[in-house]
């Protein structure tokens, strides 16, 4: 007598023999059609030349140009001659892309007007750079003093000094006014009162006024 129940496999009404026969008669799925894959050929000389030109253009206009904005303009990786970036390039030294001024750039003066060449200090039409003049302090001071003198002279010419003549009539009036100072008020100011006429009194009564 068997104890317990063992697990049974439900084959959907099929026996093991039928399952084995089904697997034996099954055919594999179809694969992609056969195709001859060509081997990679070597790079031709004209392709190497095109690649070198592409690298020079990309380096001059994108990587090293002062007018190109990128996320990380601090350093530029030195690439190989074929222009491809490899994983091993991370160990190569990096060069900084410093901000260059217009005078440091290799500009062609033929593409700039004459007035812009002088302003930017670029080469002139003859191909020579504009000579820089040094500032002479003595000449600068003399020029400043001369300009100040000319300014003062022009100011004096525009507003000449007019001397005012004294008024003779006013001086005569002042003299006449000084002669009239000796009047009766000056003589009577310190009068002792001898000319006043008062009644005598004993002192017990108050002053009597007429």
Curated annotation (Swiss-Prot):
Keywords: Cytoplasm, DNA-directed RNA polymerase, Nucleus, Phosphoprotein, Transcription. Transmembrane segments: none annotated. It is found in: Cytoplasm; Nucleus. It comes from the Eukaryota. It holds the Pfam family RNA_pol_3_Rpc31. GO terms for cellular component: cytosol; nucleus; RNA polymerase III complex. Residues 151-210 are annotated as: Disordered. InterPro entries: RNA_pol_III_Rpc31 (IPR024661). The modification Phosphoserine is found at residue 103. Residues 163-185, 193-210 have a biased composition (Acidic residues). One of its GO terms (molecular function) is DNA-directed RNA polymerase activity. GO terms for biological process: transcription by RNA polymerase III. DNA-dependent RNA polymerase catalyzes the transcription of DNA into RNA using the four ribonucleoside triphosphates as substrates. Specific peripheric component of RNA polymerase III which synthesizes small RNAs, such as 5S rRNA and tRNAs. Belongs to the eukaryotic RPC7 RNA polymerase subunit family. This is DNA-directed RNA polymerase III subunit rpc31. The lineage of its organism: Eukaryota, Fungi, Dikarya, Ascomycota, Taphrinomycotina.
């Amino acid at each position: 007598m068997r104890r317990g129940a063992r697990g049974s496999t439900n084959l959907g009404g099929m026996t093991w023999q039928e399952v084995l026969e089904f697997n034996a008669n099954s055919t594999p799925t179809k694969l992609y059609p056969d195709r001859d894959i060509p081997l990679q050929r070597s790079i031709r000389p004209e392709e190497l030349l095109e690649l070198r030109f592409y690298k020079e253009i990309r380096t001059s206009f994108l990587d090293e140009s002062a007018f190109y904005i990128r996320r990380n303009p601090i350093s530029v990786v030195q690439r190989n001659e074929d222009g491809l970036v490899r994983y091993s390039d991370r160990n190569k030294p990096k060069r900084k892309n410093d901000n260059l001024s217009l005078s440091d750039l290799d500009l062609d003066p033929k593409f700039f007007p004459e007035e812009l060449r002088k302003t930017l200090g670029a080469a002139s039409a003859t191909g020579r750079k504009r000579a820089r003049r040094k500032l002479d302090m003595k000449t600068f001071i003399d020029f400043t003093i001369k300009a100040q003198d000319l300014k003062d002279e022009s100011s004096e010419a525009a507003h000449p000094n007019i001397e005012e003549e004294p008024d003779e009539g006013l001086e005569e009036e002042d003299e006449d006014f000084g002669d009239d100072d000796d009047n009766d008020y000056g003589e009577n100011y310190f009068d002792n009162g001898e000319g006043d006429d008062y009644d005598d009194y004993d002192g017990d009564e108050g002053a009597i006024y007429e």
